[in-house]
From Swiss-Prot:
The gene is aacA-aphD. Coiled coil: none annotated. PROSITE patterns: GNAT. Keywords: Acyltransferase, Antibiotic resistance, ATP-binding, Cytoplasm, Kinase, Multifunctional enzyme, Nucleotide-binding, Plasmid, Transferase, Transposable element. GO terms for molecular function: aminoglycoside phosphotransferase activity; ATP binding; N-acyltransferase activity. It comes from Staphylococcus aureus. Involved in resistance to gentamicin, tobramycin, and kanamycin. Tobramycin and kanamycin resistance is due to the ACC activity, specified by N-terminal region. The C-terminal region is a kinase that phosphorylates several 4,6-disubstituted aminoglycosides. GO terms for cellular component: cytoplasm. This is Bifunctional AAC/APH. One of its GO terms (biological process) is response to antibiotic.
Length: 479
């Protein structure tokens, strides 16, 4: 093996490396985490150990940084005995295990291990078509665990008394990196649920939906568990939980909303769990099959729910206020401070034209109230009689412009029912300026490509930046 990227080189272990390996593996700072300080290697015993035959394919490598050897790694294809040892089910998938150490303490905590692991991921996918990679760090080695998590590994199981280390059986984690669904790894989510919620046993789990920064799972065919992994995960789920609690206390309606039974909220991880609300999600296709009477009853259900929610005294959750216009102004500043100068004249013209419209409009000066703020068909559940029975996903909710809950109801698209549907609901809702609601919807729609670019900047996702820029061109030349 010979992989070179910038300062890092990963090459095959050779005989000339063993004196340096002996130096590393007689350093107690290294042995504390790799091998154990009770190991007493000689050059001969070290050579024997690190050249012994392997059951299947193995790569033994030296890690170099700026041409200086600083560590060792081994990557091996899993075989029967290892599957049993790791408690990892054997399937037709191609799975590799790995372990490694940085033998020069001066190079610890510099991100080199993380970069090394990502290069190995790339190699195993490209050269071996691997499906997954696993490893089993000691639980008492938090520095290594953090590095593995930064690389993409996720904890999927506890391995109690798994590895003999300095005369004691050490507890370990089984960590996995998957090439197909790593961000949504159901085994990792199963582990998190059982780890953070005592006495909750996961018998079945499946992904039922995902957004830009969150994933939802159906667990035991009864509960919905959501996890958020963006930079605002703690604030986002704390707010969402508070709003669910507020609504369940104050709303007087037969329409169900999530009632949080399980929550874990921290800077590192946030999870919410609630019993699934049964029903069928509203779609344009379902709506088109309904009788006129059923359609009108559904529109009245929606208007009634929104009118009641928008009329609640929100004093107790006033900290959940969202200023859409101010947010856009701040995002414009972020654009100016980051990639604005790299944009084309067409892209800049689109942005500046939008900002002129934003500063001229009065639609942001209307009523503020508690809104869902993502009130679209795929969040509305119907019962067997096509009546509104449930509303989910209040993750974007807050005290905001009244018009925002009509954005999707007024939208003409494959996912939404159309402008006439939204206008009918607005008329049933009453005491609202329908033309201003439509203007608000149009402004939000015009902002969409800019919002996409900003999301990419905030979350360091280049594909969103590129998609937003492409959308500006599509809209500019649509005629």
């Amino acid at each position: 093996m010979n992989i070179v990227e910038n300062e890092i080189c990963i090459r095959t272990l050779i005989d000339d490396d063993f004196p340096l390996m002996l130096k590393w593996l007689t350093d107690e700072r290294v042995l504390e985490f790799y091998g154990g300080r009770d190991k007493k290697y000689t050059l001969e015993s070290l050579k024997k150990h690190y050249t012994e035959p392997w059951e299947d394919e193995v790569f033994r490598v030296i890690i170099e940084y700026n041409n200086v050897p600083i560590g060792y790694g081994q990557i091996y294809k899993m075989y029967d005995e290892l599957y049993t040892d790791y408690h990892y089910p054997k399937t037709d998938e191609i799975v590799y295990g790995m372990d490694q150490f940085i033998g020069e303490p001066n190079y610890w905590s510099k991100g080199i291990g993380t970069r090394y692991i990502k290069l190995i991921f790339e190699f195993l996918k490209k050269e071996r078509n691997a499906n997954a990679v696993i490893l089993d760090p000691h639980k008492n080695n938090p520095r290594a665990i953090r590095a593995y998590q930064k690389s993409g590994f996720r904890i999927i199981e506890d391995l109690p008394e798994h590895e003999l280390h300095e005369g004691k059986k050490e507890d370990c984690y089984l960590m996995e990196y998957r090439y197909d669904d790593n961000a949504t790894n159901v085994k990792a989510m199963k582990y998190l649920i059982e780890h953070y919620f005592d006495n909750f046993k996961v018998d079945s789990i499946e992904i039922i939906g995902s957004g830009y920064d969150s994933v939802a799972y159906l667990v035991n065919n009864e509960y919905i568990f959501k996890t958020k992994f963006s930079t605002n995960k703690k604030k986002g789920y704390a707010k969402e939980k508070a709003i669910y609690n507020f609504l369940n206390t104050n709303l007087e309606t037969n329409v169900k909303i999530p009632n949080i039974e399980y929550s874990y909220i921290s800077d590192e991880l946030s999870i919410l769990g609630y019993k699934e609300i049964k029903g069928t999600f509203l779609t344009p296709e379902i709506y088109s099959t309904m009788s006129e009477e059923e359609q009108n009853l559904l529109k009245r259900d929606i208007a009634s729910f929104l009118r009641q929610m928008h009329g609640l005294d929100y004093t107790d959750i006033s900290e959940c206020t969202i200023d859409n216009k101010q947010n856009v102004l701040e995002e414009y500043i972020l654009l100016r401070e980051t990639i604005y100068n790299d944009l084309t004249d067409i892209e800049k013209d689109y942005i500046e034209s939008f900002m002129e419209r934003l500063n001229a409009t009065t639609v942001f000066e209307g009523k503020k109230c508690l809104c869902h703020n993502d009130f679209s068909c795929n969040h509305l559940l119907l019962d067997g009689n096509n009546r509104l029975t449930g509303i989910i996903d209040f993750g974007d909710s807050g005290i905001i412009d009244e018009y925002c809950d009509f954005i999707y109801l007024l939208e003409d698209s494959e996912e939404e029912i159309g402008t006439n549907f939204g206008e009918d609901i607005l008329r049933m809702y009453g005491n609202i300026d329908i033309e201003k609601a439509k203007e608000y919807q149009d402004i939000v729609e015009e902002y969409y490509p800019i919002e996409t670019i900003v999301y990419g900047i905030k979350n360091i996702k280049q594909e969103f930046i590129e998609n937003g820029r492409k959308e500006i061109y599509k809209r500019t030349y649509k005629d």
